[in-house]
């Protein structure tokens, strides 16, 4: 069924709004994936704070104009599924990477983060970014280890001073 001009403009505006507020984007080819599997993916995406949309290539090209995701224009060929991460930069990449592992027909084309194109082969770089909470936990662990090491060195220095004095 053909879309009217107003419908196309609404789609472009909706995707453009999603792109403006997104931290990263992932483009995939969803040919061969059943409706039930796509419904499961969409549900998981909503829970992860990821906006997913299957959009015509010409419309998605217009939607990403003037955003950090303009670098993805070359990947908009064939059936295009675009996913925008709204809460965490690696959320969409992680979600689609896990989905692609289960679905052999589902293929990730590329991703974009801060205006940089990330090829499908390097999608792990984006998918393995720690979440905010994970990053804070890692920082706290580093600080905790550093302070424990400092304490040990201080106690050793104190012991050495007392031994020299004796």
From Swiss-Prot:
Annotated keywords: Ribonucleoprotein, Ribosomal protein, RNA-binding, rRNA-binding
GO biological process, one term: translation
One CC-aspect GO term: large ribosomal subunit
Keyword Transcription: no
Gene3D superfamilies membership: 3.30.70.1730, 6.10.250.2350
Top-level taxon of the source organism: Bacteria
GO molecular function, one term: structural constituent of ribosome
InterPro entries xref list: Ribosomal_uL10, Ribosomal_uL10-like_sf, Ribosomal_uL10_bac, Ribosomal_uL10_bac_type, Ribosomal_uL10_CS_bac
Pfam families, A to Z: Ribosomal_L10
Family recorded in the similarity comment: Belongs to the universal ribosomal protein uL10 family.
Assembly: Part of the ribosomal stalk of the 50S ribosomal subunit. The N-terminus interacts with L11 and the large rRNA to form the base of the stalk. The C-terminus forms an elongated spine to which L12 dimers bind in a sequential fashion forming a multimeric L10(L12)X complex.
Matches recorded under PANTHER family: 39S RIBOSOMAL PROTEIN L10, MITOCHONDRIAL
Function: Forms part of the ribosomal stalk, playing a central role in the interaction of the ribosome with GTP-bound translation factors.
HAMAP family: Ribosomal_uL10
Protein name, UniProt field: Large ribosomal subunit protein uL10
Lineage: Bacteria, Pseudomonadati, Pseudomonadota, Gammaproteobacteria, Alteromonadales
């Amino acid at each position: 069924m053909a879309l009217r001009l107003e419908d196309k403009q609404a789609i472009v505006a909706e995707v453009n709004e999603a792109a403006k507020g997104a931290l990263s984007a992932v483009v995939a080819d969803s040919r061969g994936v059943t409706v039930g599997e796509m419904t499961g993916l969409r549900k998981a995406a909503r829970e992860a704070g990821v906006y997913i949309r299957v959009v015509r290539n010409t419309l998605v090209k217009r939607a990403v104009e003037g955003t950090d995701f303009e670098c993805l224009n070359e990947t908009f060929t064939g059936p295009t599924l675009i996913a925008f991460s709204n809460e965490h930069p690696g959320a969409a990449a992680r979600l689609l990477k896990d989905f692609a592992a289960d679905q052999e027909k589902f293929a990730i084309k590329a991703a974009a983060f801060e205006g940089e194109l990330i090829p499908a082969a390097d999608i792990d770089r984006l998918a393995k970014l720690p979440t905010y909470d994970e990053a804070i936990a890692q920082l706290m662990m580093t600080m905790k280890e550093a302070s424990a090491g400092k304490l040990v060195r201080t106690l050793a220095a104190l012991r050495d001073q007392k031994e020299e004095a004796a």
